[in-house]
Swiss-Prot record:
Glycans are attached at residue 43. It is found in: Cell membrane. PROSITE patterns: IG_LIKE. This is T cell receptor alpha variable 8-3. The gene is TRAV8-3. The keyword Glycoprotein applies. V region of the variable domain of T cell receptor (TR) alpha chain that participates in the antigen recognition. Alpha-beta T cell receptors are antigen specific receptors which are essential to the immune response and are present on the cell surface of T lymphocytes. Recognize peptide-major histocompatibility (MH) (pMH) complexes that are displayed by antigen presenting cells (APC), a prerequisite for efficient T cell adaptive immunity against pathogens. GO terms for cellular component: T cell receptor complex.
Amino acid sequence: MLLELIPLLGIHFVLRTARAQSVTQPDIHITVSEGASLELRCNYSYGATPYLFWYVQSPGQGLQLLLKYFSGDTLVQGIKGFEAEFKRSQSSFNLRKPSVHWSDAAEYFCAVG
């Protein structure tokens, strides 16, 4: 069975200060087989140490927080078997799952704040 992970969108936030940040998700549409591993890329632009988030939106549902990074350990464990690794040198926070299920078919959003 093939899973389709619906188009990924970059989310842009502006803090209360004049400094802006942005997120880019280069993978527009990904199809994987059930049981295969998954990596969704997220690159950010931010001057200081960012707060990073991954959200999922399943069909007909609201956004659900998968995981977040504030500081400390760069490998973050989330819900539903997802994890993400913060790599400051690459300005990335890629979402991974070792074995996807059909129920993982959804839209995934990376955010910085």
